[in-house]
Amino acid sequence: RAGSTLISGVDQFQASLYILMAIVVTSGLFCIGLYWWMNKAILPTLALNEDEKASKGKKKGKKPTMMESFKFVMKSKELLCIALLVLCYGVVINYIDVLWKGQLKIYAGGDKSLFQAYMGEFSTITGVITLVLMILGGNILRRFTWFQAAALVPLTLIVTAVLFFGSIIYGEATRESGLPLFTLFGVSVSAVALAVQVGFWQGAVTKASKYSLFDATKEMAYIPLDNEIKTKGKAAVDVAGGRMGKSGGALTLSILQIIFPFATTVSLTPYLACASVFIFAIWFFALVKLNKSLFAEKETQEEKEELAAA
């Protein structure tokens, strides 16, 4: 509860922060000790000769720059589509994170302990859902086509985004009246409370599905490509799409803040919703194009095999 204190008179949030800092420092010292022990006891015993070390040094390539990554991605339409998938995912997740944390701060009403408890619960639920989806992910990829499996993540985001953005916009419009959104089992549910809950599960499911579905389908898209594009393309996509995805959402918010200097993050929700619609359109455009390209490669390979057999 807000303002609650421990027996020693220290604020509860401050005390929990001290505990977390102690855990982080202890874990860091443990990692340092483990790293030192591996270098002293394990690595010297490995039977690696000078030729193997030299070959490893040759195989290790330099990470491409942002401009080099863009140039390489533009050479292949498949890589461009994969980079667009990574970019769209990163931007949308950034929108959701910023808006959800803003709604959570309003819902917590300045209670830092409640905010911290929600974030801890969010991490726990995300981990549980990730474990479940990692187990079920293989079955999903076997039972459905590549396009169907790859489209599950954006479809989930679209369905939940309608509720999420809608509740925030409605809550901002009816903030002065203070009217609840609806009543469930005698309990009045406000628009902020609904946005917090929808954003909670939306973020947890989407972030968990990244490891089990999004990354898996993305890696499958590299399979039909030739070896050079496959090896260099992964690094280029990670640099171009990954970095742009992380910074794209922040760039959008910065531009909107410049255009509307007195606007709050909540008041910018309609503009972010419109931007999300545009991003989802690009996402599905890239999925359709990539799906056609993958199936064209597969059909061509099957035709070659049939001709060879004939």
Indicate where each model-derived feature is located.
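Short helix-capping/hinge motifs at transmembrane helix termini and TM-loop junctions
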Residues: N39-K40, S167-E172, P261, L290-K292
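Intracellular loop-helix junctions on the cytosolic face of multi-pass helical membrane proteins
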Residues: R1-V86, V91, Q103-D111, V277-A310
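A membrane-interface helix-boundary motif in multi-pass transporters
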Residues: R1-T26, F144-A151, S190-A191, I255-A281
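Lipid-exposed faces of alpha-helical membrane segments in multi-pass integral membrane proteins
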Residues: I19-G33, L84, C88, I125, ...
